[in-house]
Amino acid sequence: MKKKAIVCALALALAMLTACGESSSASESKKDETPKADRETIYQVSLLQGLTLGDYNGSVSVKELKEKGDTGIGTFEGVNGELIMVDGTVYRAKSDGSIETAPDDETIPFANVTFFDTDEKEDISGVSSIADLKKLLDEKVEKLGKNQFYMVRVDGTFKKMHARSELKQEKPYKPLAEALKTDQREFSWDNIEGTVVALYCPQYMKDLNAAGWHLHFVSKDKKYGGHVLELDVDKAELKIDCTQGFNMQLPDTEMFPTLDLTKDQSDDIKKVETKN
């Protein structure tokens, strides 16, 4: 009887260990199935060319976007303001240049974000125009490699910041260049502290985005911001994140499947990216 009891006890213990092992394996398997965020990837929502053709319908929520990065730029459904993501928070620069935090359930038709890791940094000063800043950044790109993606932060004081946002559009949507002719609003601030977030796309991306630099700004006090048209850097810290990966989420909007994306939109993109 004693031997039987010992055997039964051992069998019960073995069964419990086996069950625990299976439970642990299942837990580990579930953990392995959960994808880790790739910090070396630029995540893009839709094509810029889809936005410029007038597909302002959101396809990804703010909450979902924050799972893909902590730094980036974009816009909101109906181009309802300029999107600036800094340190994991998504801000909207409204049509009057003021800033608000975007709610998690708001949807996004176009954006680029990444998890920012500083690969290079330096202090800069006396960069008196956006052209001079782009020239400085282009020199960095030439050294590091022009066929990669770059997300940049410029944190500091600006003698001048000139930016734009736009009025929310209503359906039926017009192409972006046409909408901005009447609904773009511009603002200027002097001696303002804040952060410029800039994205660089290689030349081969010209059919999916705008090749070169695209800059947005949010003030340090999170009161003002927009799409940067001109600037004058007093003193700032420049930080560069070099990124090799690219992941684009095509939208599931009603409009996107029938858009003529073969059309050359380079002129329209230049119009919407620069000061008219």
What does each model-identified segment do?
Residues 1-5:
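Positively charged n-region of N-terminal signal peptides that target proteins for export
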Residues 16-19:
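C-terminal motif of bacterial Sec signal peptides marking the signal peptidase cleavage site
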Residues 21-23:
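Bacterial signal peptide processing site
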Residues 46-111:
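N-terminal low-complexity or amphipathic/hydrophobic leaders
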Residues 55-59, 81-84, 243-276:
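Intrinsically disordered, low-complexity terminal/linker regions enriched in Pro/Ser/Gly
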Residues 135-199, 206-208:
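Long, positively charged binding patches that form subdomain-scale interaction surfaces
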